[in-house]
Design a protein with these regions (language model features):
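Conserved beta-strand-loop-alpha-helix junction that forms the acyl-donor binding cleft
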Residues: 116-126
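Conserved acetyl-CoA-binding loop-helix of GNAT-fold acetyltransferases
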Residues: 82-84, 90-105, 127-131
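Conserved GNAT acetyl-CoA-binding A-motif
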Residues: 107-117
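GNAT-family acyltransferases
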Residues: 1-79, 85-87, 104, 108, ...
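A local structural micro-motif
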Residues: 96, 113-114, 137
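Residues that form or flank phosphate/diphosphate-binding pockets in enzymes
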Residues: 92, 124, 146
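Proline- and acidic/polar-enriched loop/turn elements at helix boundaries
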Residues: 100, 117-118, 141
Length: 156
């Protein structure tokens, strides 16, 4: 399931503490501290204009990953990013979470389109999006991440 992240949740995660009523993955981190700090900044920036902007991915009361709106939405389009702890990959957690995010988006009148990008080598992430009805719309080269595949799913 996805649960909206609030600033105190990020504060807890940055301290290595489980937020609210969930447990931390014990055998691997959901994200390195620098990634958590970056996601916290993104959530604050995006959240000033659009909320919710970040969610915990929770399975069996354990926070296994995160999903975020990573750019300020424009014209009904939200751009998402997501990740799951390495020890919880390959179990369908991300596929279920992105499916739930799409249900939320389709019930939010502010959202008409959800976009995401995956590395060309990240087959697992590509499958997550395909299983949730995303359509490959092109490719681009990112200065930091290299070749990326661009995806979109209608939210109306």
């Amino acid at each position: 399931m996805i649960i909206e992240l609030i600033s105190s949740d990020f504060d807890a995660l940055l301290k290595g503490i489980a937020p609210r009523h969930v447990h931390l993955v014990q055998d691997s981190a959901i994200a390195p501290p620098e990634v958590l700090a970056m996601l916290n900044r993104l959530a604050t920036d995006v959240g000033a204009n659009f909320s919710p902007s970040a969610w915990m991915i929770v399975e069996d009361d354990e926070i296994v990953g995160l999903c975020s709106v990573i750019k300020v939405p424009q014209d009904g389009k939200i751009h998402i990013g997501y990740g799951v702890a390495p020890s919880r990959q390959g179990r369908g957690c991300t596929t279920r979470a992105i499916g739930q995010l799409l249900v939320w988006a389709r019930n939010d009148p502010r959202v008409s389109l959800v976009s995401a990008e995956t590395g060309v080598e990240n087959i697992a992430s590509q499958r997550v999006l395909e299983r949730n009805g995303f359509i490959r719309i092109g490719e681009r080269i990112d200065a930091e991440d290299g070749p990326l595949i661009c995806w979109e799913a209608m939210a109306v």
